[in-house]
């Protein structure tokens, strides 16, 4: 579904992504793991149009998107859950969901999907008119996911969705991600929590200092002694 080919991305003179290549297969969860500063978020931002790479290609279903704007990428069916949740704090829960559907015109379908979000995230249903900035961290993360889903994506990019959450909420977030995938959604999941991410993923990409160090099935990475010692706390 997504193919990354020899991608190079910069922040000014800082070479953040150094010729990475990998694929995200349709219908699967691909986990992008690595330490802070490895290049995971930069990769996600490059795919969703927030950062334009200097070299290389990003192919969505065979078509290049690396020069497209973020709103153009959304219209192609790519949803984005940013690091740190980034909900609109002075808007209500309901208004945040409306923002997620801004590019859609069928009001009946939007209303249907909004109700689906409240069924999926019952915590939000009780806070429809509450300002997003007053929600707990876990509730804000649920809202960020629901907002991205309101764009009706075929591919969901998730940047550190477990960051800053209590262990019980982390488990809940990973269960939600796995459930979305079971419904057919393709997901690229950027995570420092390698153990949790690989547990639900089909494939994994390990990044270090802007490069791909390992790429394999999630199970193979979980069984790799180097990965176990460096990222899974084994050995």
Annotate the PLM regions.
Residues 1-235:
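Glycine-rich phosphate-binding loops of nucleotide-dependent enzymes
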């Amino acid at each position: 579904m997504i193919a990354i080919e020899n991608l190079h991305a910069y922040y000014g003179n800082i070479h953040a992504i150094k010729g990475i290549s990998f694929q995200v297969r349709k219908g699967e969860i691909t986990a992008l793991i690595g330490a802070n500063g490895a290049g995971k978020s930069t990769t996600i931002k490059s795919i969703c149009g927030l950062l334009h790479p200097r070299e290389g290609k990003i192919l969505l279903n065979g078509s290049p998107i690396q020069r497209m704007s973020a709103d153009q990428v959304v219209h192609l069916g790519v949803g984005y859950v940013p690091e740190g949740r980034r909900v609109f704090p002075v808007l209500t829960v309901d208004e945040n969901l409306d923002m997620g559907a801004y590019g859609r015109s069928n009001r009946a379908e939007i209303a249907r999907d909004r109700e689906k979000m409240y069924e999926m995230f019952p915590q939000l249903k009780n806070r429809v008119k509450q300002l997003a900035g007053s929600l707990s961290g876990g509730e804000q993360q649920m809202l960020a996911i629901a907002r991205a889903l309101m764009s009706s994506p075929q591919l969901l990019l998730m940047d550190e969705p477990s960051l800053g959450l209590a262990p019980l909420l982390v488990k809940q977030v990973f269960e939600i991600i796995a459930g979305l995938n079971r419904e057919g959604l393709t997901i690229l999941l950027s995570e420092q929590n390698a153990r949790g991410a690989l547990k639900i993923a089909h494939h994994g990409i390990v990044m270090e200092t802007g490069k791909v160090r390992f790429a394999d099935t999630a199970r193979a990475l979980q069984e790799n002694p180097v990965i176990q010692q460096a990222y899974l706390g084994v050995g």
